[in-house]
């Protein structure tokens, strides 16, 4: 590890820390050590792993100020937002630790009439070693949705944090080491893209990735060379649907927060709003009033921070320019709102659906508000996207009906972001927003495999699965199938 790289504070460019770049050989060694530790981690059993994970969650929250400050330094987000991220993180660790045994309990299945002499069970076992590649926007919360659940299921984990937040990743390993019964259970490796690619091809049994759709496709392709399954949590262009009967004050407050918090760097952040034309003017007026009270700035000075990844400024700028060129209008802010590394709030209205500003993920504090004649039109426009991560609905009476027609992985009715904080429900998307799930029983089962075990309880006189099967037995089977109409299985 002769080569190193630095992480910097995006607000001022100051170096936060220097970290090693793991080579492919070194990544392989770490994965090998994790595999060696795997058998002992499994032997601890659910109760033993639960104790370790609950101790870890306690250690993290007891040192919340330390890790929150590091998150703030590497991402530029306010300390209060970093604290909220940590609090939500420990909730997920605790839930996974407490529920893993129940979720993985052996299930008994009906064998069906034809195989009534058999017992049928399905067992769940850990995969072995899970690789996790994390993002920079929520550097402890998001990867923990894979890490904690994989560990609770009995896997060991090798984690590569984003090159923008390596310090957070190293802190996670150090905090785990403080309570770990032995080495190799959870290990952090640092580096750039080559290190992440090495993890994909290192022999891990599954890989979980959070990041852009473009990079996710490269990750999936690399993992495919070794037939390694993946969980991909990718980008979004999340819509907000505002019906005429919505509580506008609550809808505006939540939508503007969703769009602007964390400098708009949230995969489930509001990027496009479809509001019923009957209340559109009032909604836009309230949105402008709220946005005008917000300011981007360094932690302690702004409501939200800088763009963590410098190149994202170019994407934000190009989308705002495209929106105006294509016929949209500024309702609040202008191109002057973009002053690297900060982006002040921008509200765009009446942007054509074909514009790149509507079609592509912006990942900045920019929101588009378009009028619709009905919720039917809003649903059609919301679904007309290559993304399908989350959605928000604001309506007093139509929420469930609208939700059932949306093509996405998660929906919040009269709320925002809430599905990410509820540990018992799965998080993930469809279409170009990825596949697989984190969180909840579904998320934990991602890091297990099913083993079917069937056993003969009673030996039948009929020779069915045998070369000694007779024509009479064949006729009996067909007659039974006809009478039972498919209920043999």
Residues covered by each model-derived region:
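N-terminal Rossmann-like NAD(P)+-binding subdomain of aldehyde/semialdehyde dehydrogenases
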Residues: 1-118
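Short loop/turn microsegments at loop-to-beta-strand junctions
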Residues: 2-5, 270, 389
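Conserved C-terminal structural/oligomerization subdomain of aldehyde/semialdehyde dehydrogenase
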Residues: 9-18, 241, 342-489
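Residue-level signal for inorganic ion chemistry
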Residues: 13, 49, 71, 93, ...
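Short, well-ordered beta-strand elements within core beta-sheets of diverse protein domains
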Residues: 15-22, 36-43, 132, 240-242, ...
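ALDH superfamily catalytic-core signature
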Residues: 16, 214-352, 413, 475, ...
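Structural signal for hydrophobic packing residues in well-ordered secondary-structure cores
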Residues: 35-38, 42, 57-64, 68, ...
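Rossmann-like NAD(P) dinucleotide-binding subdomain of oxidoreductase/dehydrogenase enzymes
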Residues: 109-250, 372, 488
